[in-house]
Every structure is written in C-alpha cells, then in structure tokens.
Amino acid sequence: MRNIKMPKRVLQGVVISSKADKTVTVKVERKFKHPIYKKFVKVSKKYAAHDSENKYQEGDKVSIIESRPISKTKTWLVVNGE
C-alpha cells in the first residue's frame, strides 16, 4: 500500500495579534449563501499560527498552511505575507 498524502489546507487572512513570541493570531473570513434565506453571510474564525521569525505585525495579510500540532492550539504555519 502506497503512502498517499492529502493536500494541506491553505487559508488567507489578516494578522490581528502578534503579542506572543513566535505566534500570530490570524482572522480568516469567509462568505457563503445561507441555504434557507438566500442571503450572503460573512463568518470569521481566528487561528493561532506559528511565525518562527516574528516577522509579521498586526494588519499584515498572510497565508497559513495546515501542519502538525506545534502546541496545544497551534496547528498552522505562516507561509507568506503581502
């Protein structure tokens, strides 16, 4: 049996906190059409992401990728920013 890896999820968001060492909090927003009311709904979620170089500050747009657990709450890595 071959070892086939699933592609990792990639999300784009905005850094809302960079106070912790080597960690940034990224807010990811998504829009979807409500199935009953047919209205577009905007939902946001916060992710703790690993920033090993403390390179990103609040307001930066970044991409995060899924990874192995780094700590209790961190399972995402910052891959690049604008």
Curated annotation (Swiss-Prot):
Gene Ontology cellular component terms for the protein in this record: cytosolic small ribosomal subunit
GO biological process: translation
InterPro entries, alphabetized: NA-bd_OB-fold, Ribosomal_uS17, Ribosomal_uS17_bact/chlr, Ribosomal_uS17_CS
Pfam families linked: Ribosomal_S17 (PF00366)
SUPFAM superfamilies: Nucleic acid-binding proteins
GO molecular function: rRNA binding; structural constituent of ribosome
Keyword annotations of the record: Ribonucleoprotein, Ribosomal protein, RNA-binding, rRNA-binding
Known role: One of the primary rRNA binding proteins, it binds specifically to the 5'-end of 16S ribosomal RNA.
Family: Belongs to the universal ribosomal protein uS17 family.
NCBIfam families associated with the record: PRK05610.1 (NF004123), uS17_bact (TIGR03635)
Cross-referenced HAMAP family: Ribosomal_uS17_B
Subunit note: Part of the 30S ribosomal subunit.
UniProt-recorded name of the protein: Small ribosomal subunit protein uS17
Organismal lineage: Bacteria, Pseudomonadati, Pseudomonadota, Alphaproteobacteria, Rickettsiales
